[in-house]
Regions:
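An alpha-helical support segment within catalytic cores of ATP-dependent transferases
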Residues: 5-16, 121-188, 246-249
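Short, surface-exposed alpha-helical segments at coil->helix boundaries
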Residues: 7-8, 63, 233, 237
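Conserved N-terminal boundary motif of the eukaryotic protein kinase catalytic domain
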Residues: 17-26
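Active-site Asp-x-Gly
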Residues: 56, 136, 182-185, 198-254, ...
Length: 263
């Protein structure tokens, strides 16, 4: 679907910068922000995100994480501009080459191979270098804040939790909290649509607003869920085999899927 910028109250500098671009709204993914792909003859494609400003806005977080991630040598969008205007935040970024792994025309074995190697590379970064703390205490506190503010969409809960209230889900978070954390730098929303591939190879991470130091099961849980949804249950084990040790803990996979219901 195409959209025109004059229907949107853009910040002045962005309006000037984006003159002549054609706008196409993106519909894949679960981002709370409006996402547009911008194209113009003879110019590189860009992506623009827009969301309401407020205590649960994430675009400033995403910009900070993209800048940090690029500094670690991991492919991701370049931050071109971050603006606030008329009660909204705007993030303009470069496009990453290729297609996301949920859409790429490659075989399932290659999809899980790219996903595994991409996460393995991210998880190899020294956590001491990462300023974004997503350990259990911080994420449980964030989940509580979102619940108390009415920001949790109970209608979007996974099938096994349909009919639950956010309070019931939060009680489960507390009761089943993991006793240990195997800390790495995690993407935070490691689903197939957030990993890009070009010519069958990893080309970058996108939607990085929840990147931070957390248990590796944060990423493995969402990756397994996404692989099941997009490719089928049979491809989870090949993905985990390609990812390699340490062995995954089913209870942690389940807990981090529960945590994701709050975000």
């Amino acid at each position: 679907m195409s959209s025109r910028s004059h229907a949107i109250d853009l910040p002045h500098e962005l309006r000037q910068r984006l003159s002549g671009y054609r706008w196409h709204r993106q519909t894949i993914g679960r981002s709370q922000a409006g996402v547009f792909r911008l194209v113009a003859d003879g110019k590189p494609a860009l992506f623009l995100k827009c969301e309401r400003s407020g205590p649960f806005a994430e675009l400033a977080d995403e910009a900070a994480r993209l800048r940090w991630l690029a500094g670690q040598g991991i492919a991701c969008p370049d931050v071109i501009a971050l603006e606030s205007h008329a009660g909204h935040d705007w993030l303009l970024m470069s496009a990453v080459a290729g297609e996301d792994l949920a859409s790429a025309a490659i075989e399932p074995a290659d999809v899980v191979g790219v996903m595994a190697s991409a996460l393995r590379g991210l998880h190899a970064i020294d956590i001491a270098s990462c300023p974004f703390d997503h350990r259990l205490d911080q994420r449980i506190a964030a989940a509580r804040a979102r619940m108390e503010a009415g920001e949790v969409d109970e209608s979007d809960f996974d099938d096994e939790r349909q009919g639950w209230t956010a309070a019931e889900a939060f009680a489960g978070l507390l009761a089943l909290r993991p006793a240990t954390e195997d800390l790495v730098v995690t993407h935070g929303d490691a689903c197939l649509p957030n990993v890009m591939a070009a010519e069958g190879r990893f080309s970058g991470f996108i939607d990085c607003g929840r990147l931070g130091v957390a248990d590796r099961h944060q990423d493995l849980a969402l990756a397994c869920w996404s692989i099941r949804y997009n490719l089928g249950e049979a491809w989870i084990e090949p993905f985990l085999e390609r990812y390699g040790p340490p062995e995954t803990e089913p209870a942690k996979l389940s807990w981090y899927r529960l945590l994701d219901e709050f975000f």
